[in-house]
Amino acid sequence: MNWKRLFSGLRGGRDARLTPELRARIQSSFDQAAGDEAHFPSTIDPRIYHVKLIRNHLGDLGGKRVLDAGCGKGRFARVFQEQEPACEIWGLDISEEMLRFVPAGIHTRAGSMTELPFEDGFFDAAYATESLEHAVEIEQAVSELCRVVKPGGRIAIIDKNAEQWGKLPTPEWERWFTRKGLERLLRRHCRQVSSRYISYWEDVEPDGLFLAWLAVK
């Protein structure tokens, strides 16, 4: 697949807006990419540190309602469903084609992270793994993610470090984040916020590409 062509013609930035045209472009791009298992796999290794970090921060998921925001094919949701069948997991993604791959038993909803189709405090917890980078209107997306989590609920975000920009090819709307910048956005809505550098594997020293932000509302 020609990723440069597929994701060309757009410029992200601090003042970027998710116009109807841009939203349609992003949705179409991921709809087309849904069948590319090499770039967008349906599963992940449940041993990666991302899984352990999210699970440890969210705590006991039994009987809880949890949002996977920007879930793609639901690969993280699949792992958490297998680990805790009593957890009610919801996956939201802008691409309906991506949602077709989400495993049975996981609730799905098509939509944007900037306008989550859920009531205030609907979830006990929420996480977003490498999806906030595609939300375009980052401040609004963070606000929405916090809005739908009940007071005392936990939020985990894993995404890329702006200081490493250029290390990977990206669609032109994509945004990476500074550690302190995303902390500031979360602190507007959450009473506890922390962040750390992470690696895919717990015993591998982080190379600075990935950051995790952990919050309690």
Predicted features, each with a name:
Residues 1-60, 75, 79, 98, 156-179:
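Conserved class I S-adenosyl-L-methionine
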Residues 67, 73-115:
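Class I SAM-dependent methyltransferase SAM/SAH-binding core
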Residues 127:
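A conserved beta-strand element that flanks and buttresses the S-adenosyl-L-methionine
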Residues 130-131:
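Short catalytic micro-motifs in class I SAM-dependent methyltransferases
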Residues 139-151:
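A short glycine-rich, Lys/Arg-flanked "PGG" loop and its adjoining helix->strand segment in the class I
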Residues 175-189:
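Short alpha-helix
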Residues 191-202:
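Conserved S-adenosyl-L-methionine
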